[in-house]
Amino acid sequence: MSMDYDITPQRQVYLDARGYTILTACPGSGKTTSIVKKLLTVSHHCEEHYGTHTGFACLSFTNKACAELKQKYKEMHNERLTYPNEVLTIDSFIMQYVVLPFWYLCDECKKRPIVVNETEILDRIYYNNIQINGKWQQYPVMALRTYASLMRRKNPSLVSRDKTAFKWKHKPVIDANEIAYCNAAFTYRLEKGFISSSDALWMACDILEHHQGIAKALVMRFPYVIVDEAQDNSELHFEFFKLLKRAGLQNLEFVGDICQSIYGFNNARPELLQSMMKEGGWNVLPLSECRRSNQRIIDLYSKLKSSDVPAITSHGVEDKEIPIVVYKYDDGNVRDIIRNFHQVCENNDLPSRYIFRSIPVHFPAAY
């Protein structure tokens, strides 16, 4: 049994869109379902216009999100996603199609890399264990020994590199000595073949920038790229897709909501997506019909969102005239709030109960 999908004029415009598209999707607009609806048509588009060896790459940030896309695709189209199409996390796509096949083209990398995102494990590569007088002691590796005092204050595993600068804990490093330390720490782990996901992204951009033939081959293999949750892209993520665009990618979609970025702690730059929306060459489309909340709740939420975001309207949701309850939570009252929430639902005969804890960019809230 296939999944029902209500095609409204707004949705139809997105389904028909090709080229460079930015879809701004409000909460409850059916973003994921709309992507899934479009994927089957896009697969046919690739086959007809670019050849049977080509397909789409639909990319998101988590394995859970990718699993949901695959499951909904199966439910809607009564078939599984198969070669030559891919639904992957951005990290997996970068590793599988750029870093692992072409790591040797990155000057800093001397060994086939493996991804290690656990800081406790990554930190170990920077130290040697030496037995002195029967006791094991830890010393920095020779390449970083001159930065021993800095290593105690700033873990080398938390060093990262973006397009123009080094960072520590995702904050730019400006002191000359600290920049030299970050460069030594970054270079050392790439030489040893131990990298973080952030390092892999930097390597991918470095490889594509200096070897455009690889970027062009990737575009020939995947002539249609859809990026879900695009508001959580970092500057390097956007640079990666810019390099594909420069190599001839003619169909690129960014789908997301700049009000719902949850990876600000991990270099997410939703404002870059917002800036792109104002550039020429992009077809900016809204999905602003919310199927989750009544208009009163939407109007309250709209007081908090950016004025640049299209106005949201309720679509097909009955208003039961129940007073809106706004909870302010902290670590000490979460259980009480959940208990009260269930009681309010019970009192108003609401069988479906969902609790979301949001992590907006600018303020804490609970719904």
Residue spans of the language-model regions?
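P-loop NTPase Walker
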Residues: 1-105, 216
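Accessory N-terminal region flanking or inserted into the helicase ATPase core
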Residues: 1-27, 33-34, 55, 131-224, ...
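DNA-processing P-loop NTPase/helicase core
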Residues: 96, 101-134
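Conserved Walker B
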Residues: 222-233, 258-259
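Conserved RecA-like helicase ATPase core segment
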Residues: 235, 240-318
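Helicase P-loop NTPase motor core
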Residues: 281-283, 288-367
